[in-house]
Amino acid sequence: MSDDQNKRVNEHSKDEQLEQYRTDNSGKKMTTNQGLRVSEDEHSLKAGVRGPTLMEDFHFREKMTHFDHERIPERVVHARGFGVHGFFQVYEPMTEYTRAKFLQDPSVKTPVFVRFSTVAGSKGSADTVRDARGFATKFYTEEGNYDLVGNNIPVFFIQDAIKFPDLVHAFKPEPHNEMPQAATAHDTFWDFVANNPESAHMVMWTMSDRGIPRSYRMMEGFGVHTFRFVNEQGKARFVKFHWKPVLGVHSLVWDEAQKIAGKDPDFHRRDLWETIENGGKVEYELGVQMIDEEDEFKFDFDILDPTKLWPEELVPVKIIGKMTLNRNQDNVFAETEQVAFHPGNVVPGIDFTNDPLLQGRLFSYTDTQLIRLGGPNFHEIPINRPVCPFHNNQYDGYHRMTINKGPVAYHKNSLQNNDPSPATAEEGGYVHYQEKVEGKKIRQRSDSFNDYYSQAKLFWNSMSPVEKQHIISAFCFEVGKVKSKDVQRQVVDVFSNVDADLAEEIAKGVGVAAPAKRKASKEILTSPALSQARTVKTASTRKVAVLAGNGFHEKELQTVLEALKQEGITVDIISQNLGYMTSGSGQQLEASGTFLTVDSVLYDAVYAAGGLELKDNKQAMAFIREAYNHYKAIGAANEGIDLLQSSVGTTEGLGIVTAKDEPDYTAFSKAFIDAVAAHRHWDRRI
């Protein structure tokens, strides 16, 4: 193996490489891009104080020209994104399954860069729209960059990449008026769904709570496609990739998501940024599902169909490692905007399958980067550079940074001893899996891809009653925005193939006739792994609004705040005004927000500490009432209990914890923390 391949990476390898490109203007004199010091930056060069600007003003020309060209084309999809750095560690050697080097040594921390994104909206759209979320990970391995380019939903709308432009044209704003932004609640999207029923399964996921995640830190990630693991002996297995968030999978409610879009359009990116800035870690475990080659046709679904998942009860997920995200980016444009992911960026031991959507993506990603990043050398942009050296005969082109020495730029050659020379498998060279392929040229999908509804039914049947009601409400909202009654009827008809009761509820909600009920299958299949009801629940990293005013109880508040801090809960003190408030015993407390600057939708729970000042405050009442209606935990003590009663008409119920004149507020604190950890109290009667 060459010296290049012997170089070990660690969690800091990428950061150390990026350090070569960082610059800090603090304490520096201003210069032009050519290094010439600038003496004036507020006035252009003119002929007299009121005269015309002179063309010889090179500083003005350079400054304005650069400004005019600052923006690059935004991504056609996944335009709004946010990135973060971290590292990945495998738990145990995966030698039995793959030769991928980064999956062998548990002591190695492979640096990663992750970009989370929405799909449909433009770069300036809101974070909390109903949509799939992108979850793309770039591993900077010793063998080159490996990109796992996935979503937070394990399936996709279409089966063949040739339909991708049609899908995107359908869900993007309608071209005649460029509306609506970052939303699928319009005619063209649902017309596409009605006439392309392969999308039914993915639509069920996007209409579910998965379409409005609470946080990037609390959503799963999936590779979507079927790939291959190949080991040293050449044995291959089909594989699907999963990211499992350590905090569990949690979502917003739709009313809350819409309000957050107005109150804080940056809600998800702010949540991620602040968590890491405050010293927190964002963690996901990497899992794989594997199927032996000889079992390819063992199942009642085609394992290469991207509109199908592999039920975890049939093909268990093997957890193989953990990713820790722990460093924010230094510059969003240089990193998040310029990063270029590609499902074709693989390393030895990971290979492709004949998934027709994956095959098309292998072309499309390179093609789109060429125009977005200005040419074929985007791999030299710092965030995209591998941490291992690269050597080939790809020369020149726009923005070339590498200075290639010598006269040889071709293969084979004798002038340079045939260097750079191909590497054998033993030397780390990538060898494609030798799959036998035969068939006649044909534009047709396999009959095994024609089952559009079985897994959509599986998803529906696996939902809890609350999750089902959320799906129904989402359909009624989205399809209710459609102007064409004909399209509405078609949508109802399509989803009558999934569940008759679901179709009937949608029909009722949008005012069309329900189709005749189809004969229901006697066998009702479920997959418990698909429901969020069974997810991990913890109070760690949750965000609590503490409502307090002058006259608050010092002992009570100190006890509760310390308990929340011990659980890793973030607290904001909210009051009528910014500045300090005073307890009954004279202790001061500073407010970090007011009822004008923040809102209950930005928090996971509310603790009404009270104080005489807030007892009859209508803004405080509205704050609590909204949290109550969104099924959040509410704690109240002393005067806060009166505030709670005035807000929602009760001081009892699911997720409500109260205490008055307690000698010790430890028990109250614990009960409130448990209520926060539950995420939402869905059985609360609103």
Swiss-Prot record:
InterPro entries: Catalase, Catalase_AS, Catalase_clade2, Catalase_clade2_helical, Catalase_core, Catalase_haem_BS, Catalase_immune_responsive, Catalase_large_C
Catalysed transformations (reactions): 2 H2O2 = O2 + 2 H2O
GO biological process: hydrogen peroxide catabolic process; response to oxidative stress; sporulation resulting in formation of a cellular spore
Residues where heme binds: Y365
Coiled coil feature spans: none
UniProt entry tagged with the keyword Magnesium: no
UniProt-listed Gene3D superfamilies: 1.20.1370.20, 3.40.50.880, Catalase core domain
Cofactor(s) listed in the protein's UniProt record: heme
CDD domains: catalase_clade_2, GATase1_catalase
E.C. designation(s): 1.11.1.6
Pfam short name (any one): Catalase-rel
Residue positions of the active site: H78, N151
Region Disordered, residue ranges: 1-43
Biased composition (Basic and acidic residues): 1-27
GO MF term list: catalase activity; heme binding; metal ion binding
Key words of the record: Heme, Hydrogen peroxide, Iron, Metal-binding, Oxidoreductase, Peroxidase, Sporulation
One GO location term (cellular component): cytosol
Family: Belongs to the catalase family. HPII subfamily.
Function: Decomposes hydrogen peroxide into water and oxygen; serves to protect cells from the toxic effects of hydrogen peroxide. Involved in sporulation.
Protein name per the record: Catalase-2
Gene name of the record: katE
